[in-house]
Amino acid sequence: MPVITLPDGSQRSFSNPVTVMQVAEDIGPGLAKATVAGRIDGQLVDACELISDDAKLSIITGKDPEGVEIIRHSFAHLVGHAVKQLYPTAQMAIGPVIDEGFYYDIAYERPFTPDDLAAIEKRIAELVKTDYDVVKRMTPIAEARQQFVDRGESYKVALIDDMDESTKEVGLYYHEEYMDMCRGPHVPNTRVLRHFKLMKLAGAYWRGDSNNEMLQRIYGTAWNDKKELKGYLTRIEEAEKRDHRKLGKKLDLFHVQEEAPGMVFWHPKGWRLYQAVEQYMRQKQLDNNYQEVKTPQIVDRVLWEKSGHWGKYHENMFTTHSENRDYAVKPMNCPCHIQVYNQGLKSYRDLPFRMAEFGSCHRNEPSGALHGIMRVRNFVQDDGHIFVTEGQIQQEVSEFIDLLHEVYADFGFDNIVYRLSTRPEQRVGSDEVWDKAEKALSEALDSAGLDWEELPGEGAFYGPKIEFSLKDAIGRVWQCGTIQVDFSMPTRLGAQYVSEDGSRQTPVMLHRAIVGSLERFIGILIEDTEGAFPVWLAPEQVVIMNITDRQADYCSVLEKRLNSNGFRAKLDLRNEKIGFKIREHTLQRVPYMIVVGDKEVEQEQVAVRTRTGEDLGVMSISDFEGLLQQEIARRSRKQEVEIVL
């Protein structure tokens, strides 16, 4: 007679074994109707799971995060159900849940079209309205394999053949005539599957291997209620408006092309933006006692073998061969920085030893993973490495966090997510050293008064790390900064220092970055600001426009003066109406526009307006320069103009 303990501590006794759904029905019909799955003694199970012994039970509904994931997974099966009805010869591969949605990879004799996607979505909507039961059957693996063979589902057969020999049975889920394989859980009935949208079509290699056949991927999203779905679709629409690839073209910042996949062609305006970010970071590092270095792009494989990268990372490295030697284009800077550190024996008095480089790295990312300037093969990092003693870790991490906050604030980011990743099962170094490092990182976060999340087991094999992620204007989270403790590489590459007692010791190395990839960070800035950069970052801070040719010479004098004084000014003397020019430069997000007519020439003044349409009136060029300087010094995203004449 099982006794079921519910989350509120109440108990219910049953005379016979019961399913999760039967417990929900015993509590009330409303809960039963909303039930998606259950959690028995901490383990997620299907609603049909039988409970024979005393247990703790939570009923999972669509209001629970796990419930939403189950709804999404079940919608992936519905994609399979609909596709097989509409395109019987299609073969289903895999259909997992992803962040805020799901996808299904499918093999079919021709490419799916947008019309096909609409037809599949329509069929899914028809299927869910029938409120059919989803039936789970645990099936011996040989029998399940034969069923997929009989149905011509070669990808499912391949998945079964890859299973561990200890696997005796698999879960088969039946959506009426459609059958799919999954460990589950899945919804008990399609009545809880209502709010969804198929989003797009894409290509994907089977098993993610470019040597395998290309499949077709159908992406979708699903939510517990209509409001959540609408909110998501609104966020997606807003994200598309802010897409850095579209804005990069519209604002003439950069482009990428097939002849150099994953590598950026920076245009003049984009390169000015890039340089503004780099020069700002360079000055910040100099102000915080980092020594900037420059290390080679191509290094003999011997160094990469010593560092461990050749064995663990070789497939992602670009390599070359010359004069019977193998080389790799560096995918990261750390081994080279240790070579700089090793030039001349260091004393404990030299530590902490802070080194920085705007290092150009190349990584052979899969072509399908490339995305504008957010995911590239060639990128530059604000890379830094700090060599410390074990006792210096916490202080250095605390100072790094302070610096990171200054930088993010200047770029307009104040919503930061902090995650501490701790020791994995496979690691180097003693537990005692890991204890010290993890304690140092956590205390640095605590001393800064930060709320942070621990990710057990997610640290690198060589040490724990803190990751810093930014939330942008529409709530998306971007991982940017990091600081990682490394016990391994200094030992592998022979880094040492002379301790206070005269003995040779190995320093701990802290890998750190604040913006990370400059390309990716600029992509984030573009999307977060929608291209309306704060004045200090704007590629063009002011544009000077004449009304007629009579003002051309005066405009040229103004442009030369502003550029000579360190501002980024542009001259527009085109024979166009002034309203047309203003509109064009407003769309180009230029912060300030100077309009010059005969009156301004006569009085040696300028008429100023902002990209938001605010008319600031007429002022001297000196006053305008003061206004610009004030905006640049404040580094605020908001144009708050205070004019003192």
From Swiss-Prot:
The Gene Ontology terms for molecular function here are: ATP binding; metal ion binding; threonine-tRNA ligase activity; tRNA binding
**Which reaction is the catalytic activity of this chain?**
tRNA(Thr) + L-threonine + ATP = L-threonyl-tRNA(Thr) + AMP + diphosphate + H(+)
Chain positions covered by the region annotation Catalytic:
243-534
Cite the entry's keywords alphabetically. Aminoacyl-tRNA synthetase, ATP-binding, Cytoplasm, Ligase, Metal-binding, Nucleotide-binding, Protein biosynthesis, RNA-binding, tRNA-binding, Zinc
Where's it found, cell-wise? Cytoplasm
Q: How does it assemble?
A: Homodimer.
Please give a single GO biological process term from the UniProt record. threonyl-tRNA aminoacylation
- Name of the protein: Threonine--tRNA ligase
Q: Where is the TGS domain?
A: 1-61
The record describes the protein's role as: Catalyzes the attachment of threonine to tRNA(Thr) in a two-step reaction: L-threonine is first activated by ATP to form Thr-AMP and then transferred to the acceptor end of tRNA(Thr). Also edits incorrectly charged L-seryl-tRNA(Thr).
E.C. number: 6.1.1.3
Co-factor note (free text):
Binds 1 zinc ion per subunit.
Cite the Gene3D superfamilies for this sequence.
3.10.20.30, 3.30.54.20, Anticodon-binding domain, Bira Bifunctional Protein, Domain 2, Threonyl-trna Synthetase, Chain A, domain 2
Q: Which family does it belong to?
A: Belongs to the class-II aminoacyl-tRNA synthetase family.
Name the coenzymes or cofactors required. Zn(2+)
Taken from the UniProt entry, a GO cellular component term is: cytosol
- The UniProt record gives the binding positions of Zn(2+) as 334, 385, 511
